């Protein structure tokens, strides 16, 4: 089998080189030393480019931007977003066997417990789900955890974490890790096998991929799992820590060597993972176009990149919580480029190597005849539910006066991150930008100012409550020891309301921190009751303020504090209503 020959060849050459018997270049595999200080982050990246029987390995070990010693490609890394290609391949295999129709409703392949546990606003097809067009907003539960005991099963994940649909299916591309997990759940249900078992039986073993783990806990390959747990990962500041587990299984959970990734990539471009050539051809056929109606955008989950004059390259690239990975596939000549990294921070090496192998990037505008300055947001966002406030974090400003936005158009985040190409469209005075995995459209500056201002006011209310509680306790004790005969009746409501605001905001922050890392829906639901308490108690406080507090005889200072807390109570109610934090 061709992929096995490549694997044996790469492994043998690397081992001999590491033992010092031969240089890798003597065996026809080029080890490229790249001394460009393009990245100032600690960590390393490993690249494998395979074209026919020729394999080129580029190992970049970075310490403050300098290339150091050789790094073995047999080290274990997170595959990050490349994990999704195992899911897409599994779906295409079942489609090939006639067990799945890509244009049928996803619900036709779901078990009864899922149908009774999840109710989507609009129906969507398997193909729409593969192309990230099911309309889902971003997911904020069960993303990462450092404790494998916190991992949840795929059955529980797809029910507990079902996001709201904020777009009509088929109208907008919004990359969805949940959607990938739902596809895997479908594969699991149709094949009557656990997803990791299905992949091992139908992809890993046939290709000879022994150095890959699919399951979130990595118990399906304990040797690789142990190596992964011993590895180090680096953040933006060059600080390292232990690897995380991803409950977004299997969208982000796969770990393995870049060598195994290259074997999988070869299996895709050669069609070895499929029984029929027609299945491979369909897999590499564009299924979503850009707004111009001519430029390929997605091919059954894979992004379509434009290199050179007429060179369409398929694959994906992106970052996880602590790493980044990429895979590019040339279906015409069978060449592949794979990359894994133990640093989250993006850099320009990916762009450099991909263009070196496939040709210069094309299709990205160098300048624009019109001013596109303004505030924008991505389709990969949260705009519905208890954490809808996070939507403002997904907005950004483009200012043409500060320079042309070529970096934005090349990367999507106002910097040239991954070389993801995008297209700009102006229609009816509205600006829209499209990238492979998401759309970008204007965001109301007025709404941004309103929501941001409300956040600032809530922060001030929290600080006031934080101060008033200990001050109130001090005054209470002082009066107690001074034998104060008459305590203002309304003062107790004032202190209770201060405590309500304090815990309202404290639990609110706890929920946010938990939800954005490894929080569970159950935790969020429990914490959400603080919203009920906050809004009810705030209403009660306002009623008593009008009926009792404003009439009470007390100092001007104390009366002023009563009214300030009344403002804070009203703010809690407005904040809750605007951000849709109520559970009904």
Regions found by a protein language model. Give the residues of each.
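Catalytic loop of the DD-peptidase/beta-lactamase superfamily, centered on the K-T-G motif
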Residues: 31-61, 200, 242-474, 478-480
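Sec-dependent N-terminal signal peptides of Gram-positive bacterial secreted proteins and lipoproteins
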Residues: 9-26
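Juxtamembrane boundary at the C-terminal end of a transmembrane helix
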Residues: 575-584
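Alpha-helical transmembrane segments of polytopic membrane proteins
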Residues: 454-462, 524-537
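Short active-site loop at a secondary-structure junction
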Residues: 67-128, 165-178, 249-252, 504-507
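Short, conserved catalytic-motif segment at the N-terminal edge
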Residues: 36-79, 99-101, 108, 156-163
């Amino acid at each position: 089998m061709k992929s096995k020959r490549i694997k044996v060849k790469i492994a043998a050459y690397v081992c001999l080189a590491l033992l010092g018997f031969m240089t890798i270049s003597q065996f026809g595999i080029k080890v490229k030393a790249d001394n460009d200080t393009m990245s100032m982050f600690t960590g390393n990246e490993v690249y494998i480019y395979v074209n026919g029987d020729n394999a080129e390995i580029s190992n970049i070990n970075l310490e403050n931007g300098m290339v150091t010693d050789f790094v073995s490609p047999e080290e274990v890394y997170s595959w990050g977003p490349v994990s999704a290609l195992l899911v897409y391949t599994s779906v295409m295999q079942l489609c090939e066997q006639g067990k799945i129709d890509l244009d049928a409703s996803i619900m036709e392949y779901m078990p009864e417990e899922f149908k009774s546990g999840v109710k989507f606003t609009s129906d969507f097809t398997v193909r729409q789900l593969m192309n990230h067009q099911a309309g889902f907003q971003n997911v904020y539960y069960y993303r990462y955890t450092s404790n494998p005991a916190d991992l949840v099963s795929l059955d529980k994940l797809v029910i507990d974490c079902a996001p709201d649909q904020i777009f009509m299916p088929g109208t907008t591309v919004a990359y969805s890790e949940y959607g990938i997990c739902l596809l895997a759940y479908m594969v699991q249900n149709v094949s009557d096998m656990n997803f990791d078992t299905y992949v091992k039986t139908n992809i890993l073993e046939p290709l000879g991929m022994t150095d890959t783990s699919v399951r979130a806990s990595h118990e399906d390959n304990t040797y690789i799992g142990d190596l992964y747990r011993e590895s180090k990962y680096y953040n933006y500041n060059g600080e390292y820590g232990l690897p995380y587990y991803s409950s977004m299984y299997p969208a982000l959970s796969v770990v393995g060597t870049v060598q195994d990734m290259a074997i999988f990539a070869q299996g895709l471009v050669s069609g070895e993972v499929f029984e029929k050539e027609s299945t491979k051809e369909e897999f590499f056929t564009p299924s979503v176009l850009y707004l111009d109606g001519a430029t390929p955008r997605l091919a059954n989950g894979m992004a379509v990149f434009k290199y050179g004059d007429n060179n369409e390259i398929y694959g994906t690239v992106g970052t996880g919580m602590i790493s980044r990975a990429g895979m590019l596939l040339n279906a015409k000549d069978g060449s592949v480029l794979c990359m894994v990294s133990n640093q989250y921070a993006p850099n320009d090496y990916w762009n450099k190597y991909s263009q070196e192998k496939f040709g210069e990037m094309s299709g990205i505008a160098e300048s624009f005849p019109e001013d596109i300055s303004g505030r924008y947001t991505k389709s990969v966002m949260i705009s519905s539910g208890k954490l809808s406030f996070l939507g403002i974090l997904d907005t950004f400003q483009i200012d043409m006066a500060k320079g042309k936005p070529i970096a934005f158009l090349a990367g999507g985040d106002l910097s040239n991150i991954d070389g993801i190409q995008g297209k700009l469209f102006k229609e009816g005075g509205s600006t829209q930008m499209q990238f492979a995995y998401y759309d970008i459209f204007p965001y109301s500056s007025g709404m941004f100012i309103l929501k941001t201002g409300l956040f600032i006011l809530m922060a001030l209310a929290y600080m006031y409550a934080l101060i008033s509680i200990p001050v109130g306790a001090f005054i209470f004790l002082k009066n107690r020891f001074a034998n104060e005969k008459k305590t203002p009746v309304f003062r107790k409501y004032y202190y209770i309301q201060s405590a309500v605001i304090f815990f309202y905001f404290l639990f609110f922050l706890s929920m946010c921190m938990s939800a954005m890392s490894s929080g569970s829906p159950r935790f969020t639901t429990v914490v959400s009751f603080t919203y009920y308490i906050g809004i009810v108690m705030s209403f009660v406080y306002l009623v008593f303020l009008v009926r009792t507090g404003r009439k009470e005889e007390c100092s001007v200072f104390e009366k002023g504090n009563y009214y300030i807390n009344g403002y804070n109570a009203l703010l809690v109610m407005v904040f809750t209503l605007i951000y849709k934090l109520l559970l009904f």
